Amino acid sequence: MNRIFLNIGILLSALAVTVSCGSDEAEQDVPVQPDKPDVEEKIQANVLTKAASAVVSTRVDVGMYMQHYVDGKMVDLYAAHNYVNNVRMKYAADGWKSAEPVYWYDESSLSDIYAYAPYQSEVEDCRNMAVGVPTDQTSTEQFAAADLLWGRNLALNPTTSQISVSLNHLFAKVNVKITPEADFAEGELKASDLKVFINNVRCEGKLDLQTGDVTLSGDPQTVCARNNGDLSFTVIVMPQTLGFVNLIRVEWGDVVYVLQRSIAFDSHRSYDLTVSINKKEATGLNIGISGWDIDDKDYGGVVE
């Protein structure tokens, strides 16, 4: 029996990441691993970066799982001990490399492949993975670590050709743009003097790697956004619907501006929030969607 290496390709963009990987599901006896075939072929991992804004492309690693079919039937992912279980893909100067060789189960069995990022070194249960966003996202590393990506490719035939799994953003991105009104002198309001926070969002949850479903847990918290310069700030939040709450807080020295708003943050959407402020208060808000997915709804409002 020839042993066929899995040829893995990762495509990273603002909308998706492509990876090939594999995994299994749930409460069944774990299949016996086959003997290693004689012929080995080195894994190839190719990366195409379609958008320079895809921070994940080089800053985080990808984890992958694979599960093979038994008697022609799909097998769910187990909590652990899948055929390919949380193999790490790491970016190097010459492309993505797996921490260990990855093979198809045999020359005929179909396989399902699952992938996620950022990589977690210890996953006790891939059907109930702890995920979340840091409450401090002021650094590029913290921001990249908050962007959870997931994807799968099912019922794959063994092949020496490259296969891909599209990884989608499971969380939402919020871009806040501060616009000073006429009572500010030109250049008076500087990004370095501002801090922006998203309030009342839950930051913890669980991921089912097989389905991509995320469930929230924990109490609402406040997240500090990354300062992009030019009076713009960005933060990653988990998908959730907020009632009428103190949504955005902007701090300019001793002056605090608060926006009260109800909003639904959906997976793989990027929300552009433009907040107008004068020296006394925030006077207005316009919200649109861009970047990952487009939502043309105008959420406009008044901030006090």
Feature map (PLM): residue ranges:
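Hydrophobic core
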Residues: S13-V17
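Sec-type signal peptide cleavage vicinity
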Residues: N2-N7, T18-E304
